[in-house]
UniProtKB/Swiss-Prot annotation:
Residues 198-295 are annotated as: DUF35. Keywords: Cholesterol metabolism, Lipid metabolism, Lyase, Steroid metabolism, Sterol metabolism. It is an enzyme of class 4 (lyase). Pathway: Steroid metabolism; cholesterol degradation. This is 3-oxo-4,17-pregnadiene-20-carboxyl-CoA hydratase alpha subunit. It catalyses: 3-oxochola-4,17-dien-22-oyl-CoA + H2O = 17-hydroxy-3-oxochol-4-en-22-oyl-CoA; (2E)-octenoyl-CoA + H2O = 3-hydroxyoctanoyl-CoA; (2E)-decenoyl-CoA + H2O = 3-hydroxydecanoyl-CoA. The keyword Zinc does not apply.
């Protein structure tokens, strides 16, 4: 599963499952763990270790540092992530699609109250927005948002919004189809008027030019109605459409391509028509009206869009 549409559909299925069931921490909030944590961090606030100091500060006794919230629900070295935890399937989805790199980008925690020794914390997680693909300094990637809630009983005591980036490391070998030779193929010609489109293809987006009157146009035309320093206005297509017309090319040979191959004129959901190769379909089974979707082929130095059956 490598197509953008495939990934989006799989993400939607994971998201539709909703939050995971609350999972209880292995141990209650406890003083030994608090002692170890504050010593390791160097936090000398006495309310975490001295009962009298905590009561003087208005607490019923010693309290746990709020920043320890993740500590209480760690699974340990031998822990197994629950099947309904969305992080497991979402990581596997992107690993299988070649996005093997991972880095945390944002973490925002909210603490609703202090925890007390003896309280048993539970955790649940829910998948948020998944945005991509985006070109980053690390490589092409997807930003994955997750919302996590900690509870004591039915009371929310803390929550966290965090985001990770799953990416294909920049410079990693591209998976080039066997029937294509990028060194021999004719590369797309990009100009000031079409650069936005090919930049979109590189980012795995089909960008359609929007004219001054709001209508959509493809192929792009020079935007003579605006100053040349103003970026081209466009919308991002869903990438879905139907075959409006097609041809099966048998001869002559085309540099970098293996014959026969199918060239299809696709009418996109947005109403414009776009030409490209239809891949992954038996030429004998291609028909007008056939549902297709955009897919992208990343060569070492450039990218190309194509169509594939939308089954």
């Amino acid at each position: 599963m490598t197509g953008v549409s495939d990934i989006q559909e799989a993400v939607a299925q994971i998201k539709a499952a909703g939050p995971s069931k609350p999972r209880l921490a292995r141990d209650p909030v406890n003083q030994p763990m608090i002692n170890n944590w504050v010593e390791a961090i160097g936090d000398r606030n006495p309310i975490y270790v001295d009962d009298a100091a905590a009561r003087a500060a208005g607490h019923p006794g010693i309290v746990a540092p709020p920043a320890m919230i993740q500590v209480w629900t760690m699974m340990g070295l031998g822990g197994v992530r629950p099947k309904d935890d969305p992080l497991g399937p979402i990581i596997k989805l992107f690993d299988d699609a070649g996005y093997i790199g991972v880095v945390a980008t944002n973490c925002e925690q909210t603490y609703h109250r202090y925890l007390l020794p003896g309280e048993q914390v539970s955790i649940s997680a829910e998948l948020g927005d998944v945005v991509g693909p985006k070109q980053t300094a690390l490589g092409e990637g997807w930003f994955i948002n997750q919302h996590i809630v900690w509870q004591v009983g039915d009371e929310d005591v803390a929550e966290m919004n965090w985001r990770i980036l799953k990416f294909k490391p920049a410079g990693s070998p591209s998976s080039v189809p066997d029937d294509l030779d990028p060194d021999a193929m004719m590369r797309p010609s990009s100009s000031r008027d079409t650069a936005f489109f090919w930049d979109g293809v590189k980012a795995h987006e089909l960008r359609i030019q929007r004219l001054a009157d709001g209508s959509l146009r493809h192929p792009p035309v020079p935007a003579v109605w605006q100053d040349k320093s103003v970026p081209i206005n466009y919308v991002v297509s869903s990438g879905r459409g139907t075959v409006f017309s097609f041809v099966v090319h048998h001869a002559p040979k085309v540099p970098g391509r293996t014959v026969p191959f199918v060239i299809a004129l696709v009418e996109l959901e947005e109403g414009v028509r776009m030409l490209g190769e239809l891949r992954g379909a038996d030429p004998a089974r291609v028909a007008i009206g056939m549902p297709v979707r955009a897919t992208y082929i990343d060569f070492p130095d450039w990218s190309l869009y194509a169509w594939e059956p939308d089954e």
